[in-house]
Amino acid sequence: MAIAYYAEDIQLPAIKKKAVSGWIKAVAETYGKKTGDISYIFCSDEKILEVNRQYLQHDYYTDIITFDYTEGNKISGDLFISLDTVRTNAETFHTDYNEELHRTIIHGILHLCGINDKGPGEREIMEENENRALAILPEECR
């Protein structure tokens, strides 16, 4: 079982893969989950729009699409992250790009752990959980 990082049509972001993978595992454990096979696919806005249209029938850009293959307490999935939208969100929300990237990385893991963000009040709960996870992000990743 592994956490893997790929770049689809862009360059892989400069993240500390080993430290980030350890952080992901630590966050998952706080929800009573173990990590299975998790693939991060970093891509452009155009690629994530293509994935959104093809698999979800959504015609818009987004920062992350999570395909959940979780079985029991072992989380697994493919997570597409648009680095273009991450950059736009960092500018929009006046946050550091690196922080926004790690927020997006953990956002997908939180979905795999069962946290939603579409219903009433769920977005706030998701943000609280993201903030809790970011608080334990290893210093070398900041």
From Swiss-Prot:
Gene Ontology MF terms in the entry: metalloendopeptidase activity; RNA endonuclease activity; zinc ion binding
GO CC annotation, single: cytoplasm
Places the protein is found: Cytoplasm
Keyword Hydrolase: yes
A GO BP annotation: rRNA processing
Enzyme class: hydrolase
Keywords carried by this UniProt record: Cytoplasm, Endonuclease, Hydrolase, Metal-binding, Nuclease, Ribosome biogenesis, rRNA processing, Zinc
Matching NCBIfam families: rRNA maturation RNase YbeY
PANTHER family the UniProt entry points to: ENDORIBONUCLEASE YBEY, CHLOROPLASTIC
Protein name as it appears in the record: Endoribonuclease YbeY
Originating organism: Parabacteroides distasonis (strain ATCC 8503 / DSM 20701 / CIP 104284 / JCM 5825 / NCTC 11152)
Gene: ybeY
